[in-house]
């Protein structure tokens, strides 16, 4: 696995998995352009502040980014304790808007990696809804569809991670065929990051305790970052349209 001389855009770069991806990629010789609402505490080649839930902010960001990059790592996200409108904007609509805007700039052989979640595993149960949302082409159309098909606060995090997985699947073959760009998801389980406590609030202590009994421990952020870096590298050049669990086997315990 080698990222030498590649240019990566990493969102959510200021903490957690995003920060670890940036550190690892730079160690491997990549140029890393970070994006976040907050200033990072690590060395990057470039950094841009942006609100990834606001299409105007995303459009302004795209204007500042290089004309050619090798990979986009969509890591920024908010927990389900945020209002449902914010979860929709940051975890799905904004991510999609940024990715669509950058697709023409991603070099042939390039890669897009979306961070989903083990909590998105139930996407088959709402497949038709997720496919209908994926068929909306713009941020505004997606907002209008969601206004007509409201999502419950209690399950909004799961819903939009499911939707992200389905959207990734649906884009993968056409983008690979027409642009030679791969797009994949990684699906972490619990990870030691600043928002881990939000998941206790969101899911409840009983669910957290049950999952805790099924797994050895939460992941360290670097354990997920290494998988993302692999998916950005040429070593993964024939991996496309997958949702790769990075959960220490947690999902397998539900079979």
Regions inferred by a protein language model and the residue ranges of each:
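Catalytic loop of short-chain dehydrogenase/reductase
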Residues: 79-80, 85, 108-178, 190-192
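Rossmann-fold cofactor-recognition segment
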Residues: 42-56
């Amino acid at each position: 696995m080698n990222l030498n001389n590649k240019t990566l855009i990493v969102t959510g770069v200021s903490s957690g998995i995003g920060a670890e991806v940036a550190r690892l990629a730079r160690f491997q010789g990549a140029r890393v352009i970070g994006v976040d609402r907050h200033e990072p505490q690590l060395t990057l080649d470039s950094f841009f502040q942006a609100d990834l839930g606001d299409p105007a902010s995303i459009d302004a960001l795209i204007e500042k980014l290089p004309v050619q990059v090798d990979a986009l790592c969509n890591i920024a996200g908010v927990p389900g304790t945020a209002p449902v409108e914010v979860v929709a904007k940051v975890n799905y609509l904004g991510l999609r808007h940024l990715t669509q805007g950058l697709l023409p700039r991603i070099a042939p052989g390039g890669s897009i990696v979306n961070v989903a979640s083990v909590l998105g595993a139930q996407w088959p149960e709402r497949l038709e809804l997720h496919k209908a949302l994926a068929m909306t082409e713009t941020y505004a159309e997606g907002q209008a569809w969601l206004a007509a098909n409201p999502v419950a606060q209690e399950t909004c995090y799961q819903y939009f991670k499911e939707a992200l997985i389905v959207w990734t699947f649906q884009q993968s073959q056409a983008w690979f065929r027409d642009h030679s760009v791969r797009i994949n998801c990684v699906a972490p389980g619990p990870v030691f990051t600043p928002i881990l406590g939000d998941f206790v609030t969101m899911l409840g202590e009983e669910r957290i305790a049950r999952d805790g009994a099924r797994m050895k421990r939460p992941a360290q952020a670097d354990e997920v970052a290494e998988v993302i870096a692999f998916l950005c590298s040429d070593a993964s050049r024939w991996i496309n349209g997958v949702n790769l669990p990075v959960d220490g086997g947690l999902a397998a315990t539900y079979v």
